[in-house]
């Protein structure tokens, strides 16, 4: 499809061409922002990915990112270019899109929200500031060479906790009440939003212990500070 061609052109082909150009011009290190989408969707009971988890992308975005990783690794062997791969989960900050933007909009509306029951799921995310800080560390740390790093805020949140943070920093008067999860799933089926509802209800966690240990790094920005900055 056209979409598939665009994903592979942008995420794979252009990335590989840029890396080849960098190597030919004497650039020493190449940091590639991949995605946890290379793991595919979490399948309960396994909802936590770590540095040793097998890759199994389930959409063209994840496939194109993984293909770029493989080709960059080959370029590193051929040219000596120091390649570092970072796999972030959802990245959030000002201008965030997707489900985070939707939740923010709902909370701003001050309408009652049926998400209180989604309080036991866990979602790993990373603020833009924490991601940038990790990239800075990877630029200079010799232990980063040839590594694949997962990144997050190291503070996983439930959907209910995310809504509470939005409420706090937006000054929202929305009441959050409980609706059984099966009703939310049914709404997703009826409205054709199954994947969006799944992302709201299910867990998806990344373990960043390898990143923290290898680079002696921890996320400098707290989740509270990140949310406060996001809704300014």
What are these regions (language model features)?
Residues 1-12, 17, 21-24, 39-41:
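NAD(P)H-binding glycine-rich loop region in Rossmannoid oxidoreductase-like domains
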Residues 5-6, 35-58, 74-78:
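Active-site "gating" loop of Rossmann-like NAD(P)-dependent oxidoreductase/epimerase domains
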Residues 6-12, 47-50, 58-66, 90-93, ...:
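Short-chain dehydrogenase/reductase
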Residues 56-84:
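Active-site Tyr-X1-5-Lys
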Residues 81-102:
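Flexible, glycine-rich beta-alpha linker
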Residues 96-102, 116-140, 146-147:
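Substrate-positioning beta->alpha
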Residues 196-232:
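C-terminal amphipathic/interface module of NAD(P)-dependent oxidoreductases
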């Amino acid at each position: 499809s056209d979409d598939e061609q665009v994903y592979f052109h942008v995420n794979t082909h252009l990335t590989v061409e840029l890396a080849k150009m960098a190597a030919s011009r004497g650039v020493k290190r190449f940091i590639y922002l991949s995605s946890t989408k290379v793991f595919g969707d979490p399948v309960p009971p396994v909802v936590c990915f770590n540095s040793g988890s097998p890759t199994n992308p389930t959409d063209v975005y994840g496939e194109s990112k993984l293909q770029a990783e493989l080709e960059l690794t080959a370029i590193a062997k051929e040219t000596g270019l120091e390649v570092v791969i970072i796999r972030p989960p959802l990245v959030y900050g000002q201008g965030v899109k997707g489900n985070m933007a939707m939740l923010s909009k709902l909370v701003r509306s001050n309408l009652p929200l049926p998400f209180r029951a989604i309080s036991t799921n866990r979602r790993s995310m990373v603020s833009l500031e924490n991601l940038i800080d990790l990239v800075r560390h990877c630029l200079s740390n010799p232990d980063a060479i040839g590594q694949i790093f997962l990144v997050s805020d190291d503070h996983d949140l439930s959907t209910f906790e995310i809504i509470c943070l939005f409420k706090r920093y937006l000054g929202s008067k929305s009441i959050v009440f409980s609706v059984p999860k099966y009703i939310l799933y049914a709404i997703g089926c009826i409205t054709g939003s199954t994947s969006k509802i799944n992302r709201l209800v299910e867990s998806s966690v990344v373990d960043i212990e390898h990143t923290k240990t290898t680079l002696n790094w921890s996320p400098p920005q707290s989740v509270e500070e990140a949310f406060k900055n996001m809704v300014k």
